[in-house]
Design a protein with these regions (language model features):
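Active-site beta-loop-alpha junctions enriched in small/polar residues
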Residues: 130-132, 187-189, 225-231, 248-252
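Conserved, mostly hydrophobic/aromatic
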Residues: 48, 118, 167, 174, ...
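Alpha-helix-loop-beta-strand connector modules within alpha/beta enzyme cores
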Residues: 82-85, 107-123, 195-221
Length: 301
């Protein structure tokens, strides 16, 4: 019997808090720092120095994917990063008519260029991407999405497949650019927003198959670091389980140390928020995430 999906409580600040002041100190400018790969790379290195992180993060907002599909973006200021502004679609069918996410044009290309620059300099690059529901939230009113999930699942399957194909090409291009960790978050896909029934179906019918696909395509060349909200949904639907990383017993590594250890050994992690990277955890309590095999589904009928 499938258990309850728990909601992971977000208790960390926004990414903008880590770059306030750094943009000015580096003599970088807005919005160029969000649009130019070289400036992105410079800011990412500066943030790493400021926060004493062991990795570098890109990009500095969560609007790259939606913008690449046509969303209107307000580039904000030094303290408030880019945000989508308004909707460009009124009907779900219009999503299918949008162009593809082109990894060689626009901001995706610049983000990947920044990733490549940093990887070539020996940095461990974490690329943060967002999932389908969050992307759709920048394109269309989510009420239409949730209604479609209930009333027109065939259409929604086409919509989700389109978004998933775009994400697949972006993630594969990221690995080719030297990215070793991909942070995957779909913060809108939660129990409070979607409700347990819709989220359960979305997790089993869309999230799990997509993550299986990405694990196969990426071949563990990069670790996919799941937002714990997504990890909790997988666990609550018995779509995944946790397995100890196998780090040396008796040590207390950071969560970030766990990521670096897991690269090439596990497809996924996600027990804590990415912003908890410096939290120390007993080695035996750092886990990788193992997706349920497709063959296991038949035994639950």
């Amino acid at each position: 019997m499938v258990g309850e999906i728990k909601d992971y409580p977000c208790s960390y600040g926004t990414k903008e808090e880590s770059i306030v002041g750094v943009v000015k100190a580096c003599n970088l400018t807005v919005p160029e720092v969000y649009k130019d790969g070289e400036q992105m790379a410079e800011l990412s290195r500066a943030v790493k120095r400021t926060t004493n992180d062991g990795v570098v993060y890109l990009p500095f907002d969560h609007a790259v994917e939606a913008e690449a599909l046509g969303a209107v973006v307000n580039y904000g200021s030094e303290t408030v990063g880019p945000r989508t502004s308004g909707y460009i679609c009124d009907k779900l069918e219009e999503i299918l008519d949008l162009g593809t996410l082109d990894t060689k044009k626009g901001r995706p290309a610049q983000v990947l260029n920044a990733c490549r620059i940093l990887a070539d300099q020996g940095e461990t690059v974490v690329l943060e991407i967002v999932g389908p529901i969050t992307i759709l939230n920048g394109l269309i009113d989510l009420r239409a999405v949730f209604k479609g999930m209930r009333k027109n699942p065939e259409l929604m399957e086409k919509v989700f497949r389109k978004i998933e194909d775009d994400l697949s090409s972006y993630m594969q291009a990221a690995v080719a650019a030297g990215v070793k960790i991909i942070s995957y978050g779909d913060a809108v896909a939660t129990v409070p927003i979607m409700g347990p029934r819709v989220l359960k179906n979305y997790t089993e019918m869309n999230v799990l198959p997509f993550l299986r696909r990405m694990e196969s395509e990426l071949e563990h060349k990069a670790l996919i670091l799941l937002c714990p909200k997504t990890a909790y949904a997988l666990e609550g639907t018995e779509s995944a389980s946790y397995k100890p990383l196998g780090m040396p017993q008796g040590t207390h590594p950071t969560y970030e140390d766990g990521w670096l250890f897991a690269i090439g050994k596990f497809g996924f992690m996600g027990q804590m928020c990415i912003k908890a990277g410096k939290r120390r955890v007993p080695a035996e309590k750092l886990y990788g995430i193992i997706l349920k095999d497709e063959g296991d589904e038949d035994h639950e009928q």
